[in-house]
Amino acid sequence: MKLWMRKTLVVLFTIVTFGLVSPPAALMADKPSGQPSSLEQNDYTAFYDEHDLYDDESDDRRDPELLFQSYKEQLLDSAEDQSFLKFGSRIAPVIEDDYRKEILPKIENVISDYLATLQDDEAYQDVVISSMPSAGKTEKIFNVYNRTTGEDLLRFHVRRDHPPHDGYWFNFHYHTAEDGFQSHHELGSIYWDRNTPPNWMSA
């Protein structure tokens, strides 16, 4: 299934169910082959398909570096999908170009750097992306968490800023478990407009 079609279906599914039901695993997986499984941890649902990590007839199973790269790419794709699900069909078209150019590469670097710290003991395989962005005016885009322990590792947020006489801005930042999620680590800001932006996940 084409990426744009999959993203559209995920957004439509979320809108129709008012965000109360997670989109089917088939929409979240990169390849429809294999039977995706879901795990629920800490109020999140992670979708993954072990067959996406490598072809059954290849030697990738034995190459830790290729397995790591494949897992990382799958995680980064999931992070991108959750971002656009959060934006909804009213905000996404307006900020998509700036987000892809300015913010998404920084998010990918943060996640990649974190995964690299776990590569040697293969603990990175327990790291997953939450699949339910928050709607309305709340900040959560997605969390990166350990599916075994259920503990959050990184939290990616977007805040609406409204400086006096300067319109509305979307401020992207993240928090880490290292300091109990207290510090804001800036990723950047994207200008919206002078008018109030719609709620997150609005159709």
From Swiss-Prot:
Localisation per UniProt entry: Membrane
Protein name: Uncharacterized protein YpjP
Membrane topology of this protein: Single-pass membrane protein
TM stretches of this protein: 9-29
Gene assigned in the entry: ypjP
Gene Ontology cellular component terms for the protein in this record: membrane
InterPro entries: YpjP
Superkingdom as given in the UniProt entry: Bacteria
Stored Pfam families: YpjP
Lineage, uppermost ranks: Bacteria, Bacillati, Bacillota, Bacilli, Bacillales
UniProt entry keywords in alphabetical sequence: Membrane, Transmembrane, Transmembrane helix
